[in-house]
Design a protein with these regions (language model features):
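Kelch-like beta-propeller repeat domains
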Residues: 1-490
Length: 490
């Protein structure tokens, strides 16, 4: 069954922290990519001092290191539990907000950056407003858009901010300009071809009556404009659903799948897809359409884009945080055929505060789970998709380490004649079923010899924001290579 369903392995060691957030880091000083796990206070108000924190997993070596968490002005570790996260063009992970207070929750304004080269945290300029459960999206210029989340006073923030590495944070719609609609916490938002942002309708806890919509960012001092997008079924049952910009990104289709009608409510298996633009132009009035349903109703699940241009879904439960109704079986969606296939079952139950992401070798890791404050799932699972069992994988012998927008470049591979696709996949930075970072962008094949591909990168910065990407080649059997890292320079 491995050739159709893939296979799971539970590793013999565990994470030293609860991986509420996970981000794939570009290669460090030793040349190896690693995964950063973030716990902060780990959903435990009694956690103090050295127990706050993060861990860097060297998955090739099977080892962990523990970066020192910076201290706030009161001398306490900054608590990035339930922060927002997004990658900067230089590979650093920007982490904004977090937990100022428990019960009732209030957000932090602190902002940190994690450097994959030094494996160290640094403090950068704080936001204007605190944010707990915010959304962060990297823009075409490498700046980061942050919205929603609870402020220092516990109310939902409706004034987005943008972070520039050169000047810090600035409010997009400063008062007295009107705020945005009250976008839900951890809103699933994606950058589109034309620079607009799309809120899919996925959220945490409450959508506040806000439907899916397109957001057009202003030229200062203008204000954000919004265009509602209709057609989404079960709009009020998308709590901790999963959304993806379907591969390849230039097709501009967004899928939303699953979700619940409340934090402890019943999950849905419904799936919707919306076409937001064509190669020629934006769709003037995009509308969601019903797509084939998941086999299993899910919330708290993860959706991961694979280098064979499919989407792998794992984890979650048919009802809130119920382990008894947990879904262990995975599912794989193929956009080319518009069909779902059941995948292998994971041994470990993954519920609230679980996360999954793609590794450069094509495997998927699944970690975390925290259905109650006294329950922490530290085991690590690794999934091998079906392409691991379909024959020899193509090999990238060499490729550039940096490339500019619109540039042509060479990929050396002995399988050049058999290559079907060249893909760039942006590394994940995921939490709470929300991953605004991951996207797969097609790289056009211009010509080939028996040992090389001549390809051209898109000139559209919105389709592939600046930063580090995994470069995969995929053969005619839909079997991908191991990735090479490449940096798109601003």
């Amino acid at each position: 069954m491995s050739a159709t369903q893939g296979s799971w392995e539970t590793l013999t060691y565990q994470s030293p922290v609860l991986p509420i957030h996970a981000a794939l880091l570009s290669p460090g000083a030793d040349g190896r990519a690693k995964v950063l796990f973030l716990a902060g206070s780990g959903n435990n108000p009694d956690t103090t001092g050295e127990l706050y924190g993060s861990a860097v997993w060297d998955y090739e070596q099977g080892t962990f290191s523990r970066p020192v968490t910076p201290l706030n002005s009161a001398g306490n570790p900054i608590d990035f539990f339930c922060a927002g996260q997004s990658f900067l063009a230089d590979g650093r992970l920007l982490v904004m907000g977090g937990t100022e207070r428990y019960d009732p929750f209030e957000g932090l304004s602190d902002t940190l950056a994690f450097d994959p080269k030094t494996l160290e945290w640094t403090i950068v300029q704080s936001m204007e407003s605190g944010r707990w459960y915010p959304t962060a999206v990297t823009l075409r210029d490498g700046n980061v858009f942050a919205c929603s989340g609870k402020e220092e006073n516990g109310f939902l923030d409706t004034y987005p901010e943008i972070y520039s590495p050169s000047i810090g944070w600035s409010v997009v719609n400063p008062t007295p300009n009107p705020p945005t609609s009250p976008l839900g916490m951890y809103s699933a938002i994606f950058l589109l071809r034309d620079g607009r942002l799309f809120y899919s309708g996925g959220y945490f806890d409450n959508n506040n009556g806000v439907s899916p919509r397109l957001l057009t960012l202003p030229t200062p001092p203008g204000t954000i404009t919004e265009q509602p997008v209709g057609g989404l079924t079960d709009m009020n049952s998308r709590d901790q659903s999963a959304s993806v910009l379907l591969p390849p990104a230039d097709q501009q289709q967004v899928m939303i799948m699953g979700g619940g009608n409340s934090f402890y409510g019943t999950a849905t298996n419904s799936v919707n897809i919306v076409q937001l633009s064509t190669a020629a132009r934006a769709v003037s009035n995009p509308t969601y359409k019903v797509a084939p349903a998941l086999k299993y109703a899910r919330m708290h699940h993860s959706a991961v884009i694979l280098p064979d241009r499919t989407v792998f879904v794992c984890g979650g439960s048919g009802m809130g945080e119920s382990g008894a109704m947990a879904t262990k079986a995975g599912e794989i969606y193929n956009p080319a055929t518009n069909t779902w296939t059941e995948a292998a079952s994971e041994e470990v139950v993954r519920l609230y505060h679980s996360v999954a992401l793609l590794l450069p070798d094509g495997r998927v890791i699944s970690v975390g789970g925290n259905p109650a404050r006294d329950s922490q799932e530290l085991r690590i699972s690794v999934y091998k998709p079906p392409y691991f069992f379909k024959g020899t994988r193509p090999v990238i012998n060499s490729a550039p380490v940096k490339v500019a927008y619109g540039a042509s470049f060479q990929i050396q591979t002995p399988q050049a004649r058999a290559i079907k696709w060249v893909n760039l996949i942006r590394p994940s930075a995921a939490t709470h079923s929300c991953d605004t970072e991951q996207r797969l962008q097609n790289v056009v094949i211009n010509s080939r010899t028996s040992t090389a591909l001549n390809v051209t990168l898109t000139s559209n910065r919105n389709l592939a924001p600046p930063g580090f990407y995994m470069l995969f080649i995929t053969d005619n059997n839909n079997v991908p290579s191991i990735a090479k890292w490449i940096q798109i320079t601003p």
